[in-house]
Amino acid sequence: MKSSRKRTKRRVLQDMSISGLLLSVALLPSVVSAQDHVYLDPSSSGSPYLGPQIPLTGLPALTGTHEFTLRHIYQRGTHDQPDLHRRLDIKPHTRLWAVSDDGLEKELVTFDTPLVASSSPLTIQRLADRRLSVIEGYLAAARSRGEAVALSPSEWVMDTLAGPNVTDKESVLTFAKMTANDYIEEPGSGDWHYIHGRFNYSSSFGWQSDGLRGHIYADKTNSTIVISLKGTSPALFDGAGTTTNDKINDNLFFSCCCGQGGSYLWRQVCDCQQSAFTANLTCIVEAMNDENRYYRAAIDLYSNVTDMYPDANVWLTGHSLGGAMSSLLGLTFGLPVVTFEAVPEALPAARLGLPSPPGHDPRLPQSRQYTGAYHFGHTADPVYMGTCNGVGSICTWGGYAMESACHTGQMCVYDTVEDKGWRVALSTHRIEAVISDVLEVYEDIPPCAPEEECYDCELWKFFKSNGSESTTTSTTTTTTAPTTTRTSTCKTPGWWGCLDESTTTTTTTSTTTTTTTTTTSTCKTPGWFGCKDPTTTTEATAAPSVTTSIPTPTTYPTSSTSTCKDPGWFGCRDPPSTTASITSSPSTTSTCDDPGFFWGCYDESTTATHPITSGPSAPYSTPSPTHEHTCTSSIFFGLICVGSTGTELR
């Protein structure tokens, strides 16, 4: 009985194991189909167990070698033609011209030398959602709020992708040659595709006169795309014909306040300055985000390229202004960037409100790590080093306000000043000179390092006009002091003053003595520099009086007369001579027998003294006799007396 039960139980267990095995085999296809990029090992086709998960082929490798060819040329209009957006597809029959640095010489292009670059793993911290609509929403919010949008750490990712190998000399030279190539089509050899509808193209619209150009390179598998941005190069930089549009973009993006507050030679492109070294930041940002600016044109150009190559790995490169725009575009979408002699772009990156990872100040984008941007340049280039803004610099004389000094990402600097003894000059900024004299000459690539300890526009103060701006109130206190007013009426004006009689009276009153001083001057013979008449001064000096119930002052006159023997330009240079007497005044009688050549008399003066008599009993003064001289003969229009007669007056 027990043995039969054991046999029955063993049979049930065997049936259950067989059923479980069949069930697992039946469910095996559904389990395999739920996994991506896996396959079953053929050697274990009869096995019910899953094989190892092996990725399928076709995924881009992080390292490799790429051979690039020119595929498209994009042109995005900005100022003259803001609606222009067209594409030229390069085909075997398309004939292109390479434009020289001065914009005058053109030659047919033959693509004999391949453009080869290698890739290496590169880690970039970027947004997880990089769709154009999402990025535009962040930028619009930054413009309305006046600062970058604060995002959570979950919205950022650390991606390791295939990036340009910046330690390989051949790869760096390839990117430099991409930025140096400036191609235009031979008329009639290519068909332009107008992205926003058919454009009424006019022959007067020059290829190099407006807009941002993008040269699109692709490798043989279309897995890696290189966009080389090239702005219209100013004549001061690359020798091409400069336009006003370049100064507008340069001074708007790379100046502290749109070319204001500095040299009068700078072209001012906005009116955002409020006072000395104080500006409205909201006003500047609004001007930078206009649709006819290079940054907005670069976003449109990039979005159209990614529509054509949605699954490709995109790299960016550029020179000078194009390099700065490439760097801003790379910071916006998290793309690898290689630039050459780029204008320092940390200042516009902070003002545009580009999203910044947590833990980094969005106002200091130069402090960000893992940006994937590498800026190659040398120390003799004032644009790259941020020193082309002095009073005597060529940039200033050309009207360019290049005040920014800080780069984002990594700086790879060739020290040509120390190694080669170069002088800092704007001629070393040209990309052709950089390729032939720097990149091809140096055997090793310089080390790259971030530029963290760098600050732009430290002397300036910026405020926002959305209601949070600071207000400064100053109070001025005015103190009014008494003002003394003197009124004079001149009846006989002269060359150096008034020739009227001047009378000054000073009266001092005391209980016993009263003093009165009277000076009277009457000019009968005016000269060029004053009166030439003898000076007579009468002074009245009070003497002690007999005091009764009412004090009565008694004065006795003293008369003095002086004659000038050595007249000067502005007065008499003789020592003063005065004869005084208590009861009578001496009188001086002079008759000029030897007049001077121009003026004055050279005779010696004779002084007569009257005898002393007793004082009068009455309290009044006795006048002294005076003498009057009459000129009988004069020369030089009556200015000089030659002969005179004297008459005594009582």
UniProtKB/Swiss-Prot annotation:
Keywords: Autophagy, Endosome, Glycoprotein, Hydrolase, Lipid degradation, Lipid metabolism, Membrane, Signal-anchor, Transmembrane, Transmembrane helix. It catalyses: a triacylglycerol + H2O = a diacylglycerol + a fatty acid + H(+). The active site is at S320. GO terms for cellular component: membrane; multivesicular body membrane; vacuolar lumen. GO terms for biological process: multivesicular body membrane disassembly; neutral lipid catabolic process; phosphatidylserine catabolic process; piecemeal microautophagy of the nucleus. Its EC number is 3.1.1.3. Glycans are attached at N165, N200, N222, N280, N304, N466. Residues 1-11 are cytoplasmic. Belongs to the AB hydrolase superfamily. Lipase family. This is Putative lipase atg15.
